[in-house]
Amino acid sequence: MTSLVSLENVSVSFGQRRVLSDVSLELKPGKILTLLGPNGAGKSTLVRVVLGLVTPDEGVIKRNGKLRIGYVPQKLYLDTTLPLTVNRFLRLRPGTHKEDILPALKRVQAGHLINAPMQKLSGGETQRVLLARALLNCPQLLVLDEPTQGVDVNGQVALYDLIDQLRRELDCGVLMVSHDLHLVMAKTDEVLCLNHHICCSGTPEVVSLHPEFISMFGPRGAEQLGIYRHHHNHRHDLQGRIVLRRGNDRS
């Protein structure tokens, strides 16, 4: 399968501070990669590298031709005094045709919001509008920076359901950044745990194995949410230095 984007041993420094060290990953059509990590781990920098906004100091980046990327930012800052409907907000995107706006909103089950004020939207509604905006250029790769931030668990289930539907319909790759270190989208193909370098990687454990979780959030939640169990051979001290766990050596 041809990669959309691949990073090989990428490192990024800002001044004397090493933010990313020897990071490798591969984004493929129809596959979901979820990136986890604590605050300050370099997740946002890695996203900017994938988007082509940051040039690494070391390593190799390969992109598939004129790659179309749809991006959903972590936060949206709007002037609350500026009257702005969803329709007008989406038309601010360069190259957008007005006849494409309603179909994009309907695709994310948000057609009814077309004339709603942006400032009045809930967290989940805002994420759907931003996702519709990302779909306007028919992306081959969706980059979602903490798409479930500020959304409750039921909203997360609905968003994950929608993301899974879109990746199947579009056969697009998905890079998803998560602020939750353990609860991830169950249908993620690969999870990477980042703390300036790749600490560990693997697949999520589907929560359908946990009856207590099913009783709390229902079978639909169990289908869309998964637990990722970390398997680090080290920890990081307060200065960010690697401290190997007992029984492991640096080799």
UniProtKB/Swiss-Prot annotation:
Residues binding ATP, per UniProt: 37-44
Translocase among keywords = yes
One GO MF term, please? Answer: ATP binding
Q: Could you tell me the Gene Ontology terms of the biological process aspect for this record?
A: response to zinc ion
Q: Known catalysed reaction(s)?
A: Zn(2+)(out) + ATP(in) + H2O(in) = Zn(2+)(in) + ADP(in) + phosphate(in) + H(+)(in)
Question: What domain of life?
Answer: Bacteria
| Coarse class of the protein's main subcellular location | membrane
- Please give the PANTHER family that the UniProt record associates with this protein: METAL TRANSPORT SYSTEM ATP-BINDING PROTEIN TM_0124-RELATED, ZINC IMPORT ATP-BINDING PROTEIN ZNUC
Quaternary structure and partners? The complex is composed of two ATP-binding proteins (ZnuC), two transmembrane proteins (ZnuB) and a solute-binding protein (ZnuA).
Q: What does this protein do?
A: Part of the ABC transporter complex ZnuABC involved in zinc import. Responsible for energy coupling to the transport system.
This chain belongs to the protein called Zinc import ATP-binding protein ZnuC
- From the UniProt record, report the name of the gene that encodes this protein: znuC
